Design a protein with these regions (language model features):
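A polyanion-binding, active-site-adjacent surface
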Residues: 2-218
Length: 218
Protein backbone atom coordinates (compact mmCIF):
# COMPACT_ATOMS: atom_id res chain seq x y z
CA UNK A 1 0.00 0.00 0.00
CA UNK A 2 1.38 3.39 -1.02
CA UNK A 3 0.93 6.49 1.11
CA UNK A 4 -0.33 9.38 -1.02
CA UNK A 5 0.94 12.63 0.48
CA UNK A 6 3.11 15.55 -0.54
CA UNK A 7 4.06 16.33 3.06
CA UNK A 8 7.62 15.65 4.13
CA UNK A 9 7.26 16.77 7.75
CA UNK A 10 4.64 15.01 9.86
CA UNK A 11 2.98 13.40 6.80
CA UNK A 12 0.37 11.62 8.93
CA UNK A 13 -0.68 14.64 10.98
CA UNK A 14 0.42 13.46 14.42
CA UNK A 15 -0.70 15.82 17.17
CA UNK A 16 0.70 14.77 20.55
CA UNK A 17 -0.14 16.94 23.54
CA UNK A 18 3.36 18.32 24.09
CA UNK A 19 3.68 20.14 27.42
CA UNK A 20 5.73 22.86 25.72
CA UNK A 21 6.88 23.60 22.16
CA UNK A 22 10.43 22.76 21.19
CA UNK A 23 11.01 26.35 20.09
CA UNK A 24 9.25 29.38 18.65
CA UNK A 25 9.71 27.79 15.23
CA UNK A 26 8.59 24.25 15.94
CA UNK A 27 6.04 22.50 18.13
CA UNK A 28 7.92 19.20 18.01
CA UNK A 29 10.46 17.25 15.98
CA UNK A 30 7.87 15.41 13.93
CA UNK A 31 8.57 12.41 11.72
CA UNK A 32 10.22 13.51 8.49
CA UNK A 33 11.08 12.12 5.09
CA UNK A 34 9.71 9.75 2.47
CA UNK A 35 6.30 8.48 3.63
CA UNK A 36 6.80 5.34 1.51
CA UNK A 37 10.29 4.59 2.77
CA UNK A 38 11.74 1.12 3.15
CA UNK A 39 14.30 2.41 5.69
CA UNK A 40 13.19 3.99 8.98
CA UNK A 41 15.80 5.68 11.20
CA UNK A 42 14.62 5.82 14.82
CA UNK A 43 16.13 8.17 17.38
CA UNK A 44 15.44 9.08 21.00
CA UNK A 45 14.28 12.69 21.49
CA UNK A 46 15.33 16.16 20.26
CA UNK A 47 17.53 16.88 23.27
CA UNK A 48 19.87 14.06 22.25
CA UNK A 49 19.67 13.77 18.49
CA UNK A 50 18.63 17.32 17.58
CA UNK A 51 15.75 19.18 16.00
CA UNK A 52 14.56 21.59 18.69
CA UNK A 53 14.82 24.61 16.40
CA UNK A 54 14.27 23.01 12.99
CA UNK A 55 11.53 20.56 14.00
CA UNK A 56 13.37 17.92 11.96
CA UNK A 57 14.91 14.78 13.54
CA UNK A 58 18.67 14.37 13.30
CA UNK A 59 19.50 18.02 12.67
CA UNK A 60 21.53 20.68 14.53
CA UNK A 61 23.55 18.34 16.74
CA UNK A 62 26.70 16.29 15.99
CA UNK A 63 24.71 13.05 16.24
CA UNK A 64 22.34 14.21 13.53
CA UNK A 65 25.18 15.42 11.33
CA UNK A 66 26.82 11.98 11.53
CA UNK A 67 23.58 10.20 10.63
CA UNK A 68 22.88 12.53 7.72
CA UNK A 69 26.38 12.08 6.31
CA UNK A 70 25.92 8.30 6.36
CA UNK A 71 22.57 8.70 4.59
CA UNK A 72 24.21 10.88 1.95
CA UNK A 73 27.02 8.38 1.37
CA UNK A 74 24.48 5.60 0.88
CA UNK A 75 22.18 7.47 -1.50
CA UNK A 76 19.29 8.28 0.84
CA UNK A 77 20.04 12.01 1.13
CA UNK A 78 20.86 14.51 -1.60
CA UNK A 79 23.51 16.35 0.43
CA UNK A 80 25.81 15.63 3.40
CA UNK A 81 23.74 17.80 5.74
CA UNK A 82 20.64 19.96 5.68
CA UNK A 83 18.23 21.44 8.21
CA UNK A 84 15.48 20.22 5.87
CA UNK A 85 17.18 17.30 4.10
CA UNK A 86 15.84 15.91 0.85
CA UNK A 87 15.42 12.19 1.49
CA UNK A 88 14.50 9.27 -0.74
CA UNK A 89 13.37 5.87 0.57
CA UNK A 90 14.20 6.94 4.12
CA UNK A 91 12.14 8.26 7.04
CA UNK A 92 13.37 9.80 10.30
CA UNK A 93 11.51 9.86 13.59
CA UNK A 94 11.90 9.81 17.36
CA UNK A 95 10.50 7.68 20.14
CA UNK A 96 9.68 11.00 21.82
CA UNK A 97 9.09 13.87 19.37
CA UNK A 98 8.29 16.50 22.03
CA UNK A 99 10.72 18.65 24.05
CA UNK A 100 9.94 18.40 27.78
CA UNK A 101 10.24 21.67 29.68
CA UNK A 102 12.42 20.01 32.32
CA UNK A 103 14.85 18.49 29.84
CA UNK A 104 14.87 14.70 29.63
CA UNK A 105 11.55 12.87 29.17
CA UNK A 106 10.25 10.81 32.07
CA UNK A 107 9.28 7.14 31.79
CA UNK A 108 5.63 8.23 31.88
CA UNK A 109 6.23 10.72 29.08
CA UNK A 110 7.87 8.08 26.90
CA UNK A 111 4.90 5.80 27.54
CA UNK A 112 2.46 8.55 26.55
CA UNK A 113 4.31 9.11 23.28
CA UNK A 114 4.48 5.42 22.38
CA UNK A 115 1.13 5.32 20.56
CA UNK A 116 2.18 8.15 18.24
CA UNK A 117 5.46 6.48 17.38
CA UNK A 118 3.82 3.10 16.83
CA UNK A 119 1.12 4.62 14.62
CA UNK A 120 3.75 6.32 12.49
CA UNK A 121 5.85 3.18 12.22
CA UNK A 122 2.78 1.23 11.13
CA UNK A 123 1.92 3.86 8.53
CA UNK A 124 5.43 3.92 7.08
CA UNK A 125 5.62 0.10 7.11
CA UNK A 126 9.35 0.13 6.39
CA UNK A 127 11.30 -3.09 5.95
CA UNK A 128 14.52 -1.97 7.64
CA UNK A 129 14.53 -0.33 11.08
CA UNK A 130 17.63 1.59 12.15
CA UNK A 131 17.48 2.39 15.88
CA UNK A 132 20.06 4.96 16.98
CA UNK A 133 21.35 4.54 20.52
CA UNK A 134 20.55 2.08 23.28
CA UNK A 135 17.08 3.35 24.23
CA UNK A 136 15.79 3.15 20.66
CA UNK A 137 17.44 -0.23 20.19
CA UNK A 138 15.91 -1.63 23.39
CA UNK A 139 12.47 -0.46 22.33
CA UNK A 140 12.76 -1.90 18.82
CA UNK A 141 14.09 -5.23 20.11
CA UNK A 142 11.25 -5.46 22.62
CA UNK A 143 8.43 -4.44 20.29
CA UNK A 144 9.50 -5.71 16.88
CA UNK A 145 11.80 -8.70 17.38
CA UNK A 146 10.49 -10.44 20.54
CA UNK A 147 14.14 -11.04 21.44
CA UNK A 148 14.53 -8.74 24.44
CA UNK A 149 16.67 -10.54 27.01
CA UNK A 150 18.21 -12.77 24.36
CA UNK A 151 20.28 -10.03 22.75
CA UNK A 152 23.01 -8.27 24.70
CA UNK A 153 22.44 -4.57 24.13
CA UNK A 154 26.10 -3.78 23.61
CA UNK A 155 25.81 -1.10 20.96
CA UNK A 156 29.53 -1.12 20.19
CA UNK A 157 29.25 -4.79 19.17
CA UNK A 158 25.82 -4.53 17.54
CA UNK A 159 26.64 -1.41 15.51
CA UNK A 160 25.87 -1.81 11.80
CA UNK A 161 25.04 -5.51 12.21
CA UNK A 162 21.83 -7.22 11.08
CA UNK A 163 19.23 -8.44 13.57
CA UNK A 164 16.23 -10.31 12.19
CA UNK A 165 12.93 -9.30 13.72
CA UNK A 166 9.25 -10.12 13.30
CA UNK A 167 9.16 -9.26 9.62
CA UNK A 168 11.72 -6.48 10.01
CA UNK A 169 15.44 -6.29 9.46
CA UNK A 170 16.95 -4.29 12.32
CA UNK A 171 20.28 -2.50 11.87
CA UNK A 172 21.47 -1.09 15.23
CA UNK A 173 23.39 2.19 15.17
CA UNK A 174 25.69 3.07 18.02
CA UNK A 175 25.18 6.51 19.56
CA UNK A 176 27.04 8.69 17.03
CA UNK A 177 28.77 10.75 19.72
CA UNK A 178 30.35 7.47 20.91
CA UNK A 179 31.60 6.42 17.48
CA UNK A 180 35.19 5.31 17.24
CA UNK A 181 37.37 5.24 14.15
CA UNK A 182 35.72 3.15 11.46
CA UNK A 183 32.20 3.15 12.93
CA UNK A 184 30.88 5.58 10.33
CA UNK A 185 32.29 3.53 7.47
CA UNK A 186 30.93 0.31 8.97
CA UNK A 187 27.46 1.79 8.88
CA UNK A 188 27.89 3.01 5.31
CA UNK A 189 29.18 -0.38 4.14
CA UNK A 190 26.32 -2.18 5.88
CA UNK A 191 23.64 0.05 4.36
CA UNK A 192 25.13 -0.24 0.88
CA UNK A 193 25.16 -4.03 1.18
CA UNK A 194 21.55 -4.12 2.36
CA UNK A 195 20.40 -1.79 -0.41
CA UNK A 196 21.95 -4.15 -2.92
CA UNK A 197 20.14 -7.18 -1.47
CA UNK A 198 16.55 -8.40 -1.31
CA UNK A 199 15.85 -6.81 2.05
CA UNK A 200 12.06 -6.81 1.75
CA UNK A 201 10.40 -9.21 4.15
CA UNK A 202 6.78 -9.96 4.92
CA UNK A 203 5.87 -8.15 8.15
CA UNK A 204 2.89 -9.08 10.31
CA UNK A 205 1.42 -5.79 11.57
CA UNK A 206 -1.87 -7.32 12.73
CA UNK A 207 -1.24 -6.48 16.38
CA UNK A 208 -1.53 -2.78 15.60
CA UNK A 209 -5.12 -3.09 14.38
CA UNK A 210 -6.78 -4.03 17.66
CA UNK A 211 -9.04 -6.51 15.81
CA UNK A 212 -8.87 -10.10 14.60
CA UNK A 213 -8.06 -8.92 11.08
CA UNK A 214 -4.73 -10.01 9.61
CA UNK A 215 -2.50 -7.31 8.15
CA UNK A 216 0.67 -8.31 6.32
CA UNK A 217 2.95 -6.03 4.31
CA UNK A 218 5.99 -6.72 2.16
Amino acid sequence: MENVTDRTSNPFGMRPACESPCSERSEAAFGYGDANADFHVIGDYPGIHGGRETGVPFTERPAGEAIQRALFETGFASEPYGDAPELENCFLSYLHMCCPADGEPTAESYANMERFFDAELRAIAAHVLLPVGERAMEYVVDQYTARLGRIELDMAKLHASEVRGSGFLVVPIREPTDWEEGDGQRLIDSLLAIRGSDYRRTADLSRFLGTDELYFVR
